[in-house]
Amino acid sequence: MLRLGSHVSMSGKKMLLGASEEAASYGSNTFMIYTGAPQNTRRKPIEELNIEAGLEHMKAHDMADIVVHAPYIINIGNSVKPETFELGVNFLQSEIERTRALGAKQIVLHPGAHVGEGADKGIKQIIQGLNEALIHDQDVQIALETMAGKGSECGRTFEEIAQIIDGVTHNELLSVTFDTCHTHDAGYDIVNDFDGVLNEFDKIIGVDRLKVLHINDSKNERGAHKDRHANIGFGHIGFDALHYIVHHPQLADVPKILETPYVGEDKASKKAPYKWEIAMLRNGEFDPDLLNKIQNS
C-alpha cells in the first residue's frame, strides 16, 4: 500500500493529535514529525504529547508507519568539541524514548558533520556515538539519511553510510532514509537511471535497510552539493522521476515523506503545498500551474 505524507507540526496542546489532524487534511496516510523545535533541545515530557488521542485519530484515519526526525542540533560527528558530541549522544537516547512512546519505528538522523577534521575521523566519531546511544533491546531504528555533501557533512555517498553501518555493533538497529534531493545533489543520477542507483544502493548498503523515503525536488543541478528543496516537478529532478520513485514496486512498503517548501512570497501567508503535491503524485499528472493555484487558494 502506498504510504504518502509530509512533514507536519507537532505543537501546542494537541501535539500528536494535531499532527495527525494536519496530515489528514492533506490526504496523507503517514507523516513525519519533530518531537519539538529542530534547532533546540527543549522538549515536553512524554505524558504531555497527547499520545492516546493522537493514536486514536491515526487509527480512525488509516495513518501508519509514521516517522520522527531527530533535531539538527545533534552532531555526533564532532570530534573537536566533546560537549557537542556528548549532547548529541544523550539527546539521541532521549529522542529514541520519545519515538518509542509515539509508536514510531524510525527516527531519521543526519549522520553528522566532521567540522573540518576529515570524513574518516567524522565517520569514526559517528560510529562511536551510535555505539553509545543504541540500546540492543530497543524497537526503534535510527534511519541514517543520505546527505547532499554540503560543508563537512558525512553520509554523502552510499559507501560512507555503509562504513558507518559496518562499524556499529548493534547495526540491526540502523536503517536508511533515502532523500531524493540530497542524493541528486550528491551526484547520483536518479532522473535518468533510478533503477541503476537503487541497484548500486542495494549492492553497497542493501535495499532491505531502506525504511524511509524523503520525496523532494531540487533547486540545483545534479552534483551541486547544495541541499535546497524545490516543490514537486518544479526543480531539476522533475515530476516524472519523482512519480516513478514514489510508485516503484521495490519500495512499495516504504513510507514516502514530502519536505517541500511552503508556497508564497510573504512569510506570514505562505501555504503548505502538501495536499496538492500528494494528490498530484497519486494521480500521476503534473500541473504546471500548481504553485499559482496554491497561492490563490
Curated annotation (Swiss-Prot):
In the record, biological process GO terms are: base-excision repair
Alphabetical list of Pfam families matching this protein: AP_endonuc_2 (PF01261)
Q: What is this protein called?
A: Probable endonuclease 4
Chloroplast as UniProt keyword: no
- Catalysed reaction(s)? Endonucleolytic cleavage to 5'-phosphooligonucleotide end-products
- Recorded superkingdom: Bacteria
Which HAMAP family does the UniProt entry name for this protein?
Nfo (MF_00152)
* Alphabetical list of InterPro entries matching this protein: AP_endonuc_2, AP_endonuc_F2_Zn_BS, Xyl_isomerase-like_sf, Xyl_isomerase-like_TIM-brl
Q: Which of UniProt's keywords are assigned here?
A: DNA damage, DNA repair, Endonuclease, Hydrolase, Metal-binding, Nuclease, Zinc
Q: What one GO molecular function would you report for this record? A: zinc ion binding
Q: Which residues bind Zn(2+) 2?
A: E145, D179, H214, E259
- Name the species this protein comes from: Listeria monocytogenes serotype 4b (strain F2365)
Q: What class of enzyme is it?
A: hydrolase
Q: What NCBIfam families is this protein classified in?
A: nfo, PRK01060.1-1
Q: Which gene is annotated as encoding this protein in its UniProt record?
A: nfo
Q: Where along this sequence does the record place binding of Zn(2+) 3?
A: H182, D227, H229
Q: Which residues does Zn(2+) 1 bind?
A: H69, H110, E145
Please tell me whether the keyword Chloroplast is annotated for this protein.
Answer: no
Q: Enumerate the cofactors the protein uses.
A: Zn(2+)
Report the Gene3D superfamilies cross-referenced here: Divalent-metal-dependent TIM barrel enzymes
Describe the task this protein carries out: Endonuclease IV plays a role in DNA repair. It cleaves phosphodiester bonds at apurinic or apyrimidinic (AP) sites, generating a 3'-hydroxyl group and a 5'-terminal sugar phosphate.
Q: How is the cofactor bound?
A: Binds 3 Zn(2+) ions.
UniProt lists the family membership as follows: Belongs to the AP endonuclease 2 family.
